[in-house]
Amino acid sequence: FIGWEGLGISSWALIGNWYKDDDELTFVGKVGDLMFGRPAWTTPSYAAYRAIATIRFGDMFMLGAIAAIGVLSHSLNFTGSGAVNWGSLFNMIGVAGTAALLILFLLGPFTKSAQFPFNDWLLTAMTGPTSVSALLHSATMVAAGVYIFMRLTLSIYDAGALSAPGVLVTYLVVIYIGLLTALLGSLLALAVNERKVILAGSTMASLGLMMGITAVSPYINSTVTIGSYIVPVAVLVAFLYLIIHALSKATLFLVSGHLIHETGTRFNAGDFELAKRMKLAFYSTIAAAITLGGVPPLAGYWIHAGMDDVVSSVGQYVGWGAYALLILASVVYVAFLARFTSLNFIKGERVKHVEGHGGLTMAISYSITATVALATVAIPFTLGVPSVLINPGLDAYVIGIGVVLWVIFIAVLIKPRSESLGGLTNLFERRYYIQALMDIILAGFGEALSAFTYLISRGIDALFNDLLPSLFTGFSRIIRRVQVGLLDLYARYIYIVVVVMLIIALILVIVYG
């Protein structure tokens, strides 16, 4: 958990690297654009605050769930001796308790991995340096949420508790949230025009796929043995996708940073003349795009085949809507990859000014990651997983989907414009208005909290500055009337008190004998 928190703090510091907010090139959104009367663009300092606030929201509930698990099971270990006995724990707290506990725990991974509706912080996090985006926001920080979910799933599987009713209910919710996030992220990536925001939207989509596929685990009995470990097929497929996504998306982010340096703009721009001048960037983009997009015969195709097989095999249990979301997200995803490639290297606006710095140093980094991404084609034939990926990939139906993805990729390369989305383009460019709604809700909550604390503060001030002094003043006036300094008067008071006490004592004796 300490490492988990360290990731959030690191991300906050790096997203806000240009905290002076003095360079529009580091902003996200069009400067001057408004949503509900509020700025639609985001500066680095505010993006950093948004990221840490969103992540801490989920971490707060996650920490509460961890504490509850520790108290109820007397263990905080996922694996090894003394690991949490999930079966006993779930039986103890019942279906509703299990679902509540898991949902509270998963709010941490959900916010960290930018699942809908906690996704906007990732999109505005693109104010940070591009190298930071390539590391934290494609391979490490955002993937940590998915990884923790995978570890949790494996731990529950090892305890034989994946079939618990509360687990089934919770994981069904996660399936649909993950796949819906995948579709929304893909649509956003297809429509927006900022290079890094496009890639952030696609990262959101990929994380949704990983979450959704992992959550299928309780509904499918297939497992695979790797060494001495028995792993649910769904978890393995999601983990392999995490690997190729990290390599391919890091490549695209690094290329994007080089493009921003070369063109002087964070928006899509570049034609084939730019591609000829930046050959390594162009080839690396193509390599990453076809690897990640699931076009055959690269690793992405076989892994997507595994996803199709996993989700389609449980359609009768989770509903065929999940499979429909997966197919739609995959189609839109490959279209965004082709559009990104085309608008920056083939059919985009001609670059009027090329700064020409960065050069070979930048090119070497993304050339290496692109080469490794292509090398992942060996994954389906290693690790003892051919039956998990190769068999589904050779199915005629899946081959047909792969061919369709190739056709879509080439078609969008030729005609990359998104005008066909019509009025929806504005919705996507404004990121589903989540930023504005969150700002309004959070601002309203903050204003209400501020007003409440102001009232409390005024009440405390009134108590100590007005009420108590007034009481002491009044009491002092009463005392002054009694304490006049005359001894004979004091003697009379004592005499009266003694007489009253004697009368009371006499009455008590008469009444009670």
Give each language-model segment a name.
Residues 53, 58, 278, 358-369, ...:
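Loop-to-transmembrane boundary segments
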Residues 336, 407-417, 504-508:
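Alpha-helical transmembrane segments
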Residues 351-408:
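Hard-cation-handling environments
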Residues 385-394, 419-513:
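Aromatic-capped, Gly/Pro-kinked transmembrane alpha-helices
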Residues 142, 178, 207, 285-289, ...:
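Hydrophobic membrane-spanning alpha-helices of multi-pass integral membrane proteins
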Residues 58-67, 286-293, 368-379, 447-455, ...:
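Hydrophobic alpha-helical membrane-insertion segments
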Residues 1-3, 9-356:
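Hydrophobic transmembrane alpha-helices and their helix-loop junctions in integral membrane proteins
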Residues 70, 290-306, 371-390, 459, ...:
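Alpha-helical transmembrane segments and their membrane-interface junctions
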